[in-house]
UniProtKB/Swiss-Prot annotation:
Its EC number is 2.3.3.14. HAMAP family: Homocitr_synth_fung_arch. CDD domains: DRE_TIM_HCS. Catalyzes the aldol-type condensation of 2-oxoglutarate with acetyl-CoA to yield homocitrate. Carries out the first step of the alpha-aminoadipate (AAA) lysine biosynthesis pathway. To a lesser extent, can also use oxaloacetate in place of 2-oxoglutarate, leading to citrate. Does not display 2-isopropylmalate synthase activity since it cannot use 2-oxoisovalerate. Exists in an equilibrium between monomer and homodimer. This is Homocitrate synthase. Pathway: Amino-acid biosynthesis; L-lysine biosynthesis via AAA pathway; L-alpha-aminoadipate from 2-oxoglutarate: step 1/5. It comes from Thermus thermophilus (strain ATCC BAA-163 / DSM 7039 / HB27). InterPro entries: 2-IPM_HCS-like, AIPM/Hcit_synth_CS, Aldolase_TIM, DRE_TIM_HCS_fun_bact, Homocitrate_synth, LeuA/HCS_post-cat, PYR_CT.
Length: 376
C-alpha cells in the first residue's frame, strides 16, 4: 500500500452540516484535538463566507499547530487575496467543471483554465510558501476530456490536484480508473486529493480505491458530517485502512482519541453517535450469537476486524439472550467463580434461553440466576 495523508474538513465541510454552528472556541477545540490526534491537514471555511469566518481562519492559522491549516475557496482572485491575508498554510481552489456547474457559473473550459492560472499565479507570487491545490468540482459528472485538459494545464503550477465526488454518485471502479488517468496526466510530482460525498454510501470505498489508484490525500470529517449526507467519515476511513495497514495507521495517529473526537463533535452539533457507527458506535463490538460468543472467548480475532482497545473502546458480550450458548454461560459462570457439571450447564443454559424468550435479561439478572442455580 502507498503512503497517504488525511485532510480533515470538519471545520469546512463539517460546517456545512445542517446542525453545525461552531463557535470560534469550538473550532479551536476541534483543531487542537485533530492536531493531537495526528491529522496532517485541517481545512477551514473560506474566509469570504462571513466576517466571522475570516476571523476564525486567522485564529486557526495562528495556533502554531503541527497540522497545516488550509482554506477552501472558489477559484476567484478576490477570494484568493483574502485567503492569503489570513496566514493559512494552504489554499484549496475549486472550479466547477461539470455541465451542471458550468451552466451555473457561465464559463467554458478554456475560460476555466485561463482564470485558474491567473489565480494560481497570484497566490504563487503573493505567498510562495503556501501550498496550492486545484480541484475540479463535480469531477465525476464532468466530461473526462475536459477534466484532463484542466488538470494538465494547472499541474505545473500546483502542489496538488483534487478530485471531488460532489454529489456522491461515483462508484469505486470509476474512482480507481479516473485517479489512475489523472496520475498519468499530472505526473509523479503532483499530489492527488480525493473528496467523496456519501449520498450513495460509497464514500469510504471510494476513498480507499482512490489511494489504491495513486491518490496521496483523502478528505474526511469527524462522524462524516457535511453537506447533505456528508463525506468520508474519519473513523470509518481509519477502520478501512487499519485492516490493511495496521502498523502504518497506528504509527501515524493517536487512535485511542477517536471516541473523544466523535463525542466532542456529536455534542457540538447536537446529535447522538449512531449505534452502528464505525468503531465508536454502541454496538460496534457487540457479540450476541452463541457461536460468536464461543469464538470470541477463545480468540477475539475470529469475529473482530481490529481490536477495540486500539481505538480506546471495549467489546460487549450479550450473554443473557435466547441466542446464547453453553460456552458463553460457562465462561460467565467461571468469571463469577462458579462451576457446573455438563448436565447442569446444559440445564441452566436452557433455563436462561427460556427466560430470555419472555424478554431480554440484564447481566445482573443473569448473574443472580447463575448464583441461585448453584445453591438451589
Amino acid at each position: 500500500m502507498r503512503e497517504w495523508k488525511i485532510i480533515d474538513s470538519t471545520l469546512r465541510e463539517g460546517e456545512q452540516f445542517e446542525k453545525a454552528n461552531f463557535s470560534t472556541q469550538d473550532k479551536v477545540e476541534i483543531a487542537k484535538a485533530l492536531d493531537e490526534f495526528g491529522i496532517e491537514y485541517i481545512e477551514v471555511t473560506t474566509p469570504v463566507a462571513s466576517p466571522q469566518s475570516r476571523k476564525d481562519a486567522e485564529v486557526l492559522a495562528s495556533l502554531g499547530l503541527k497540522a497545516k491549516v488550509v482554506t477552501h475557496i472558489q477559484c476567484r482572485l478576490d477570494a484568493a487575496k483574502v485567503a492569503v491575508e489570513t496566514g493559512v498554510q494552504g489554499i484549496d481552489l475549486l472550479f466547477g467543471t461539470s455541465k451542471y456547474l458550468r451552466a451555473a457559473h457561465g464559463r467554458d473550459i478554456p475560460r476555466i483554465i485561463e482564470e485558474a492560472k491567473e489565480v494560481i499565479a497570484y497566490i504563487r507570487e503573493a505567498a510562495p510558501h503556501v501550498e496550492v491545490r486545484f480541484s475540479a468540482e463535480d469531477t465525476f459528472r464532468s466530461e473526462e476530456q475536459d477534466l484532463l485538459a484542466v488538470y494538465e494545464a494547472v499541474a505545473p503550477y500546483v502542489d496538488r490536484v483534487g478530485l471531488a465526488d460532489t454529489v456522491g454518485v461515483a462508484t469505486p471502479r470509476q474512482v480507481y480508473a479516473l485517479v489512475r488517468e489523472v496520475r498519468r496526466v499530472v505526473g509523479p510530482r503532483v499530489d492527488i486529493e480525493f473528496h467523496g460525498h456519501n449520498d450513495t454510501g460509497c464514500a469510504i470505498a471510494n476513498a480507499y480505491e482512490a489511494i489504491e489508484a495513486g491518490a496521496t490525500h483523502v478528505d474526511t470529517t469527524i462522524l462524516g458530517i457535511g453537506e447533505r449526507n456528508g463525506i468520508t467519515p474519519l473513523g470509518g476511513f481509519l477502520a478501512r485502512m487499519y485492516t490493511l495497514q495496521p502498523e502504518y495507521v497506528r504509527r501515524k495517529y493517536k487512535l485511542e482519541m477517536l471516541p473523544e473526537l466523535d463525542r466532542m463533535v456529536a455534542r457540538m452539533v447536537g446529535v447522538e453517535i449512531p449505534f452502528n457507527n464505525y468503531i465508536t458506535g454502541e454496538t460496534a463490538f457487540s457479540h450476541k450469537a452463541g457461536m460468536h460468543l464461543k469464538a470470541i472467548y477463545i480468540n477475539p480475532e475470529a469475529y473482530e476486524p481490529y481490536p477495540p482497545e486500539v481505538f480506546g473502546v471495549k467489546r460487549k458480550l450479550i450473554i443473557a439472550s435466547r441466542l446464547t450458548g453453553r460456552h458463553a454461560i460457562k465462561a460467565r459462570a467461571e468469571e463469577l467463580g462458579l462451576h457446573y457439571g455438563e448436565e447442569e450447564l446444559h440445564r441452566v443454559t436452557q433455563h436462561i434461553k427460556a427466560l430470555a424468550d419472555r424478554g431480554q435479561l440484564t447481566l445482573e439478572e443473569l448473574d443472580r440466576i447463575l448464583r441461585e442455580w448453584i445453591t438451589a
